Amino acid sequence: MTAKKTINRAVRGWCRHLALEACSSLAGLRGQFRGFDDRCCGVQLVLLHRIQPHEERKFEQFIVWLTKNFKVVSYSRAVEIIESRERVEPTVAISFDDGFKDNLKASEILSRHGLSACFFVCPSIIGETCPEKIKKFSFANLRKKDVREFLNWSELEQMKVAGHEIGNHTMAHRCLSDLQKSEFLDQVGGARSELMSRLGDVDHFSWPFGRFIHFKAEWVDDVLQLGHQSCASGVRGVHSPEHERGHDPAFDKTVMRNTVDMAWPLRHSQYFLSYNLLVGK
């Protein structure tokens, strides 16, 4: 990355931070996010990636805030509600992408609070211990430089026994919109087959990178025909009976997920989830 791009990214980051600080502070002053009335309804799927050791306390605070302000359900239950277009109180389900090692600790924190999540993983990197292979995979496929460990099969089994769900995130985290149909089927179908052979049922899929430009709308039906009950993006939104899904009609069979990051100030994540309900009521 050039110095100019680095500076531009830093400037955009600070502008985003300042805008969110202003919005979340103003909303707090107005008391908008201190509880929802009966006009607020809908399901939101939360998307996380990593919980660093120094972020564990903040993650637990976030979980406590969720339980106080939303009905928190399993990922599968949330998908059922979305598909049935059932009108429900503000409801949230939690998911993680990529299968980083620290997801094990996140699952333990969730279990301690009686909650579960769906962890979307890529079989080709599960259990890998070679630093060079991890570095190469992370840089080429995840576009990250600081990853050192991924979950192994034993840990995934442990998480599933604890009540969490394991989802399909393709075999190797390729950008699916760059692939031919046969490669796409290998990435998605191959991953599901391997996950099922190791862990049993795999009901949900999420595509890497998460934006609509990273997937092909005509492949949504293929994902479902392979046996998945849902096909998830990383596009923000709330699912309610009054609103269409996916913002783009071509993706109306997909489910939206709202990215939050424990590296952000907690109030920013709270603002996103609260604002979704207020604009969606």
Predicted ranges, named:
Residues 61-69, 109-114, 162:
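A short, Lys/Arg-enriched amphipathic alpha-helix followed by its capping loop at the start of a domain
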